[in-house]
Protein backbone atom coordinates (compact mmCIF):
# COMPACT_ATOMS: atom_id res chain seq x y z
CA UNK A 1 0.00 0.00 0.00
CA UNK A 2 2.81 2.40 0.82
CA UNK A 3 4.11 2.02 -2.73
CA UNK A 4 0.86 3.30 -4.27
CA UNK A 5 -0.51 5.97 -1.96
CA UNK A 6 0.69 9.56 -1.67
CA UNK A 7 3.34 9.41 1.13
CA UNK A 8 2.23 12.74 2.59
CA UNK A 9 -1.44 11.74 2.80
CA UNK A 10 -0.49 8.42 4.40
CA UNK A 11 1.41 10.23 7.18
CA UNK A 12 -1.15 12.95 7.97
CA UNK A 13 -1.74 12.95 11.71
CA UNK A 14 1.37 10.83 12.29
CA UNK A 15 4.34 13.05 11.47
CA UNK A 16 2.82 15.43 8.89
CA UNK A 17 0.09 18.04 9.16
CA UNK A 18 -2.38 19.54 6.71
CA UNK A 19 -1.66 22.46 4.37
CA UNK A 20 -5.19 23.85 4.91
CA UNK A 21 -5.68 24.38 8.65
CA UNK A 22 -9.19 25.55 9.39
CA UNK A 23 -12.62 24.30 10.42
CA UNK A 24 -15.94 25.16 8.75
CA UNK A 25 -19.55 24.09 9.02
CA UNK A 26 -20.94 21.91 6.25
CA UNK A 27 -22.55 24.90 4.53
CA UNK A 28 -19.27 26.81 4.24
CA UNK A 29 -16.85 23.95 3.73
CA UNK A 30 -17.21 23.61 -0.04
CA UNK A 31 -16.85 27.35 -0.67
CA UNK A 32 -13.72 27.63 1.46
CA UNK A 33 -12.19 24.52 -0.12
CA UNK A 34 -12.62 25.93 -3.64
CA UNK A 35 -11.25 29.24 -2.37
CA UNK A 36 -8.12 27.44 -1.14
CA UNK A 37 -7.70 25.77 -4.54
CA UNK A 38 -8.02 29.13 -6.34
CA UNK A 39 -5.47 30.74 -3.99
CA UNK A 40 -2.91 27.98 -4.53
CA UNK A 41 -3.47 27.94 -8.29
CA UNK A 42 -3.05 31.72 -8.51
CA UNK A 43 0.08 31.83 -6.32
CA UNK A 44 1.80 28.97 -8.18
CA UNK A 45 0.93 30.47 -11.58
CA UNK A 46 1.99 34.03 -10.74
CA UNK A 47 5.20 33.00 -8.96
CA UNK A 48 6.43 30.18 -11.19
CA UNK A 49 10.06 31.33 -10.92
CA UNK A 50 10.04 31.65 -7.11
CA UNK A 51 10.60 27.89 -6.44
CA UNK A 52 7.51 27.49 -4.23
CA UNK A 53 7.32 24.25 -2.27
CA UNK A 54 3.91 24.63 -0.63
CA UNK A 55 1.23 27.14 0.33
CA UNK A 56 -0.24 26.82 3.83
CA UNK A 57 -3.63 28.45 4.45
CA UNK A 58 -5.02 29.15 7.93
CA UNK A 59 -8.33 30.83 8.70
CA UNK A 60 -8.73 32.53 12.08
CA UNK A 61 -12.13 34.16 12.71
CA UNK A 62 -13.08 36.23 9.62
CA UNK A 63 -9.43 36.40 8.54
CA UNK A 64 -7.08 34.47 6.27
CA UNK A 65 -3.39 33.78 6.82
CA UNK A 66 -1.35 32.53 3.82
CA UNK A 67 2.19 31.19 4.31
CA UNK A 68 4.31 30.62 1.21
CA UNK A 69 7.35 28.33 1.51
CA UNK A 70 9.84 29.39 -1.15
CA UNK A 71 13.52 28.94 -1.99
CA UNK A 72 13.63 32.44 -3.55
CA UNK A 73 11.74 34.77 -1.21
CA UNK A 74 13.29 37.86 -2.81
CA UNK A 75 11.30 37.28 -6.00
CA UNK A 76 8.06 37.28 -3.99
CA UNK A 77 8.85 40.29 -1.81
CA UNK A 78 10.10 42.50 -4.65
CA UNK A 79 11.78 45.88 -4.40
CA UNK A 80 10.95 47.49 -1.03
CA UNK A 81 8.13 44.97 -0.55
CA UNK A 82 6.05 46.25 -3.46
CA UNK A 83 5.35 42.84 -5.00
CA UNK A 84 4.30 41.17 -1.76
CA UNK A 85 1.89 44.00 -0.98
CA UNK A 86 0.35 43.70 -4.44
CA UNK A 87 -0.05 39.93 -3.92
CA UNK A 88 -1.61 40.46 -0.49
CA UNK A 89 -4.21 42.86 -1.92
CA UNK A 90 -5.09 40.39 -4.68
CA UNK A 91 -5.54 37.55 -2.17
CA UNK A 92 -7.72 39.80 0.01
CA UNK A 93 -9.98 40.40 -3.01
CA UNK A 94 -10.20 36.66 -3.67
CA UNK A 95 -11.12 35.79 -0.08
CA UNK A 96 -13.23 38.88 0.81
CA UNK A 97 -11.43 38.85 4.15
CA UNK A 98 -8.48 40.50 5.83
CA UNK A 99 -5.49 38.52 4.54
CA UNK A 100 -1.98 38.39 5.98
CA UNK A 101 0.91 36.99 3.95
CA UNK A 102 4.02 35.30 5.37
CA UNK A 103 7.07 34.12 3.44
CA UNK A 104 9.19 31.22 4.77
CA UNK A 105 12.58 30.64 3.16
CA UNK A 106 13.57 27.05 2.35
CA UNK A 107 17.19 26.72 3.43
CA UNK A 108 17.95 23.50 1.53
CA UNK A 109 15.94 23.43 -1.72
CA UNK A 110 18.12 20.54 -2.95
CA UNK A 111 16.29 18.15 -0.57
CA UNK A 112 12.77 19.53 -1.09
CA UNK A 113 10.87 17.06 -3.30
CA UNK A 114 8.56 19.61 -4.96
CA UNK A 115 11.41 21.98 -5.84
CA UNK A 116 13.50 19.08 -7.18
CA UNK A 117 10.59 18.02 -9.43
CA UNK A 118 10.11 21.61 -10.65
CA UNK A 119 13.83 21.92 -11.41
CA UNK A 120 13.88 18.70 -13.45
CA UNK A 121 10.75 19.81 -15.34
CA UNK A 122 12.37 23.13 -16.25
CA UNK A 123 15.50 21.34 -17.45
CA UNK A 124 13.45 18.98 -19.64
CA UNK A 125 11.69 21.99 -21.17
CA UNK A 126 15.14 23.42 -21.98
CA UNK A 127 15.97 20.11 -23.75
CA UNK A 128 18.48 18.91 -21.13
CA UNK A 129 18.90 15.12 -21.25
CA UNK A 130 16.54 13.59 -18.68
CA UNK A 131 19.14 11.14 -17.32
CA UNK A 132 21.59 13.98 -16.70
CA UNK A 133 18.91 16.06 -14.94
CA UNK A 134 17.87 13.13 -12.73
CA UNK A 135 21.43 12.16 -11.82
CA UNK A 136 22.39 15.74 -10.98
CA UNK A 137 19.36 16.10 -8.68
CA UNK A 138 20.13 12.81 -6.92
CA UNK A 139 23.77 13.74 -6.33
CA UNK A 140 22.84 17.18 -4.94
CA UNK A 141 20.24 15.73 -2.56
CA UNK A 142 22.55 13.02 -1.20
CA UNK A 143 25.38 15.52 -0.77
CA UNK A 144 23.18 17.83 1.33
CA UNK A 145 21.97 15.23 3.82
CA UNK A 146 19.14 13.20 2.28
CA UNK A 147 19.24 9.54 3.32
CA UNK A 148 17.57 8.40 0.12
CA UNK A 149 15.90 9.72 -3.02
CA UNK A 150 13.89 8.26 -5.89
CA UNK A 151 12.94 10.07 -9.11
CA UNK A 152 10.45 8.84 -11.73
CA UNK A 153 10.20 10.46 -15.17
CA UNK A 154 7.47 9.30 -17.56
CA UNK A 155 6.36 10.34 -21.04
CA UNK A 156 8.01 10.63 -24.44
CA UNK A 157 11.48 10.94 -22.93
CA UNK A 158 14.09 12.22 -25.36
CA UNK A 159 11.43 12.52 -28.07
CA UNK A 160 10.88 8.75 -28.29
CA UNK A 161 7.92 7.48 -30.31
CA UNK A 162 6.64 5.32 -27.44
CA UNK A 163 6.13 6.78 -23.96
CA UNK A 164 7.92 5.02 -21.12
CA UNK A 165 8.94 5.47 -17.50
CA UNK A 166 12.54 5.79 -16.28
CA UNK A 167 13.55 5.95 -12.63
CA UNK A 168 16.68 6.52 -10.60
CA UNK A 169 17.20 5.79 -6.90
CA UNK A 170 20.00 6.19 -4.42
CA UNK A 171 19.98 5.35 -0.71
CA UNK A 172 16.78 3.97 0.82
CA UNK A 173 13.21 5.28 0.67
CA UNK A 174 11.04 3.29 3.17
CA UNK A 175 7.48 4.09 2.09
CA UNK A 176 5.76 1.59 4.43
CA UNK A 177 7.43 2.92 7.62
CA UNK A 178 5.12 5.60 9.03
CA UNK A 179 7.80 7.18 11.23
CA UNK A 180 10.01 7.83 8.20
CA UNK A 181 10.10 11.47 7.05
CA UNK A 182 9.38 11.07 3.33
CA UNK A 183 8.82 14.20 1.26
CA UNK A 184 6.94 13.85 -2.04
CA UNK A 185 6.54 16.21 -4.97
CA UNK A 186 5.35 16.19 -8.58
CA UNK A 187 5.72 18.42 -11.62
CA UNK A 188 4.90 18.45 -15.33
CA UNK A 189 7.28 19.36 -18.15
CA UNK A 190 5.55 20.70 -21.26
CA UNK A 191 7.94 19.64 -24.03
CA UNK A 192 7.61 19.77 -27.82
CA UNK A 193 6.73 16.06 -27.81
CA UNK A 194 4.06 16.24 -25.10
CA UNK A 195 3.83 16.36 -21.33
CA UNK A 196 6.37 14.49 -19.20
CA UNK A 197 5.51 13.75 -15.57
CA UNK A 198 8.08 13.88 -12.77
CA UNK A 199 7.63 12.33 -9.31
CA UNK A 200 10.19 12.71 -6.51
CA UNK A 201 10.45 10.95 -3.14
CA UNK A 202 13.06 12.18 -0.62
CA UNK A 203 13.79 10.29 2.61
CA UNK A 204 15.19 12.65 5.28
CA UNK A 205 15.45 10.24 8.21
CA UNK A 206 13.13 8.90 10.89
CA UNK A 207 11.00 11.02 13.21
CA UNK A 208 11.10 9.15 16.51
CA UNK A 209 9.26 11.41 18.98
CA UNK A 210 5.88 9.93 17.92
CA UNK A 211 7.14 6.35 18.15
CA UNK A 212 6.35 4.59 21.50
CA UNK A 213 9.54 2.55 21.09
CA UNK A 214 11.67 5.64 20.48
CA UNK A 215 12.81 6.22 24.08
CA UNK A 216 13.88 2.58 24.42
CA UNK A 217 15.71 2.72 21.07
CA UNK A 218 17.52 5.94 22.03
CA UNK A 219 18.55 4.45 25.39
CA UNK A 220 19.92 1.36 23.64
CA UNK A 221 21.87 3.50 21.18
CA UNK A 222 23.25 5.61 24.05
CA UNK A 223 24.37 2.47 25.91
CA UNK A 224 26.04 1.14 22.76
CA UNK A 225 27.87 4.42 22.11
CA UNK A 226 28.93 4.61 25.77
CA UNK A 227 30.31 1.07 25.79
CA UNK A 228 32.20 1.67 22.52
CA UNK A 229 33.79 4.86 23.91
CA UNK A 230 34.80 2.98 27.08
CA UNK A 231 36.44 0.27 24.95
CA UNK A 232 38.38 2.94 23.04
CA UNK A 233 39.69 4.39 26.32
CA UNK A 234 40.75 0.94 27.55
CA UNK A 235 42.57 0.23 24.29
CA UNK A 236 44.32 3.58 24.49
UniProtKB/Swiss-Prot annotation:
One example of a Gene Ontology biological process annotation: translation
Quaternary organization: Part of the 30S ribosomal subunit. Forms a tight complex with proteins S10 and S14.
Family of the protein in this entry: Belongs to the universal ribosomal protein uS3 family.
Record's keyword annotation contains RNA-binding: yes
Domain KH type-2: 39-107
NCBIfam families the UniProt entry points to: rpsC_bact
Biological source species: Bartonella tribocorum (strain CIP 105476 / IBS 506)
Region span, Disordered: 214-236
A Pfam family reported for this protein in Swiss-Prot or TrEMBL: Ribosomal_S3_C
Superkingdom, taxonomy of origin: Bacteria
GO CC annotation: cytosolic small ribosomal subunit
Protein name: Small ribosomal subunit protein uS3
Role summary: Binds the lower part of the 30S subunit head. Binds mRNA in the 70S ribosome, positioning it for translation.
Keyword terms, alphabetized: Ribonucleoprotein, Ribosomal protein, RNA-binding, rRNA-binding
Entries under InterPro entries matching the protein: KH_dom, KH_dom-like_a/b, KH_dom_type_2, KH_sf_prok-type, Ribosomal_S3_C_sf, Ribosomal_uS3_bac-typ, Ribosomal_uS3_C, Ribosomal_uS3_CS
Amino acid sequence: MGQKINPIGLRLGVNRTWDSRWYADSGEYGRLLHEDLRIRSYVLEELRQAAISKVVIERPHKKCRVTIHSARPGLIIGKKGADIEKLRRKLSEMTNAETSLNIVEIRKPEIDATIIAQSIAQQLERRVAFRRAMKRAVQSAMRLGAEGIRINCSGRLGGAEIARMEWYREGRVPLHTLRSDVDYGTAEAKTAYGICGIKVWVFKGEILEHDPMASERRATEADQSGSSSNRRRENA
